[in-house]
């Protein structure tokens, strides 16, 4: 997760949320 700001509430990268790539984001979180 280097180079990304992580949302501590979800553990997801903020950039994922901004791009709307929720499925990809969830995989990255896990």
Swiss-Prot record:
The entry assigns this protein to a family as follows:
Belongs to the long (4 C-C) scorpion toxin superfamily. Sodium channel inhibitor family. Beta subfamily.
- Protein purpose: Binds to sodium channels (Nav) and inhibits the inactivation of the activated channels, thereby blocking neuronal transmission.
| Domain remark text | Has the structural arrangement of an alpha-helix connected to antiparallel beta-sheets by disulfide bonds (CS-alpha/beta).
Q: Which UniProt keywords apply?
A: Ion channel impairing toxin, Neurotoxin, Secreted, Toxin, Voltage-gated sodium channel impairing toxin
Q: Provide the tissue specificity.
A: Expressed by the venom gland.
Organism name: Centruroides tecomanus (Scorpion)
Q: Which domain of life is it from?
A: Eukaryota
Residue span(s) of domain LCN-type CS-alpha/beta:
1-30
Q: Which InterPro entries match?
A: LCN-type_CS_alpha_beta_dom, Scorpion_toxin-like_sf, Scorpion_toxinL/defensin
Q: What is this protein called?
A: Neurotoxin II.22.5
**Could you tell me where this protein is found in the cell?**
Secreted
What Pfam families does the record point to?
A: Toxin_3
Look up keyword Transcription regulation and say if it applies. Answer: no
One GO location term (cellular component): extracellular region
Q: Tell me the GO molecular function terms.
A: sodium channel inhibitor activity; toxin activity
